[in-house]
Design a protein with these regions (language model features):
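Sec/Tat signal peptide C-region and signal peptidase I cleavage site
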Residues: 14-18
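Short loop/turn motifs that connect adjacent beta-strands in outer-membrane beta-barrel proteins
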Residues: 24-32, 78, 117-127, 175-181, ...
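Hydrophobic, lipid-facing positions within transmembrane beta-strands of outer-membrane proteins
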Residues: 34, 65-69, 106-112, 128, ...
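Surface-exposed strand-loop-strand hairpins of Gram-negative outer-membrane beta-barrel proteins
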Residues: 41-66, 154-155, 249
């Protein structure tokens, strides 16, 4: 069994989330262990069919970049804590109109993971965990356009709302009795509350399944390589503005792609993943994810707090 790094749960806006800093998402960090990580996520969406009348209040960025910094502490065999702070860049482009957007601090998250199931066998290890915690409104909410008019809440780096994140993760190593084949499922939701200005962004649900194979592993497990296909389902509920539901702003999307992790040395992984839109719903103002690219690096270490 490889020396595992924890899964970093990244989701600060209704976008496809990058699978985290480890090839297996269910295990927590080892007791007394620490981890620092950086994850870079690029997301593009198609243009709205018609936005000649201005920026719709439910518009999503046509391009966004999120750089996530996190630190994780494994304080118990089955528990760990993660603090995540994102830096977000949003851009909105429309035909015949200047591009608007900007960069700012995103909403921070404080997450706790609990592994409630582990079973070892000759085939491999099966593990399951839950993760939960608040998303705190630390993000910037004052981006404006060229006329100094406030951009919609959906284009701001921060939401202005205190939301709740909950996830369930399952990892099954040794699929079909192949010890190098790993099935990994991440199912999570971000439950939204009203934010700024008088906007409640639609809550999000995401299910991501990754089937990875380890074609290379050094004898001392210091270096390894995982690669495999991923399938992601995204669901966004309709936004609400001033108490009025914005029908057609939410929808569903299906992404397919590939993700690869490489262990460079003990405790250090780098990863790269790409996903593309294969199917989506067609709400009046729904802007599905078209392409999703992410890469990152993580390093684990021991923490001596007392």
């Amino acid at each position: 069994m490889i020396a595992l790094l924890p899964f970093v749960l990244i989701l600060a806006a209704p976008r496809a989330r990058a699978q985290g800093s480890a090839p297996e998402t269910a295990p927590p960090l080892f007791p007394g262990g620490g981890l620092i990580s950086y994850n870079s996520v690029f997301t593009t969406r198609g243009l709205l069919p018609d936005s000649s009348g201005g920026i719709p209040p439910t518009a999503r960025p046509t391009f966004s970049h999120e750089g996530d910094f996190n630190i994780t502490w494994g304080f118990h065999r089955n528990f760990d804590l993660t603090i995540l702070v994102p830096i977000v860049t949003n851009r909105f482009a429309s035909a015949g109109q200047p591009t608007v957007g900007g960069t700012g601090l995103g909403d921070a998250m404080l997450l706790a993971k609990y592994r409630f199931y582990r079973r070892d066998s000759q085939r491999g290890t099966t593990q399951a965990s839950v993760t939960f915690g608040p998303k705190i409104p630390t993000g910037r909410t004052n981006l404006t356009d060229g006329n100094r008019s406030l951009l919609p809440a959906s284009l701001q780096p921060g939401s202005g709302s205190t939301d709740f994140f909950i996830a369930a993760n399952w990892t099954y190593t040794g699929l079909f009795n192949l010890k190098r084949l790993v099935a990994d499922e991440d199912f999570h939701s971000l439950l939204r509350t009203p934010g700024t200005p008088a906007t409640r962004l639609g809550s999000d649900i995401e299910s991501r399944f990754w089937l990875s194979y380890r074609p290379y592993e050094s004898k001392n497990v210091a270096r390894e390589w995982f690669i495999g296909p991923a399938l992601t389902w995204l669901h966004s509920q309709n936004d609400r503005i001033s108490g009025v539901t914005q029908n057609g702003s939410g929808g569903d999307g299906l992404l397919a792609g590939v993700t690869s992790y490489v262990g460079l040395r003990p405790g250090m992984h780098v990863w790269l993943g790409m996903d593309w839109d294969v199917a989506h719903s067609t709400g009046a103002t729904f802007m599905p994810v078209r392409r999703h690219i992410r890469f990152g690096i993580t390093q684990q270490f021991r923490m001596h707090l007392w």
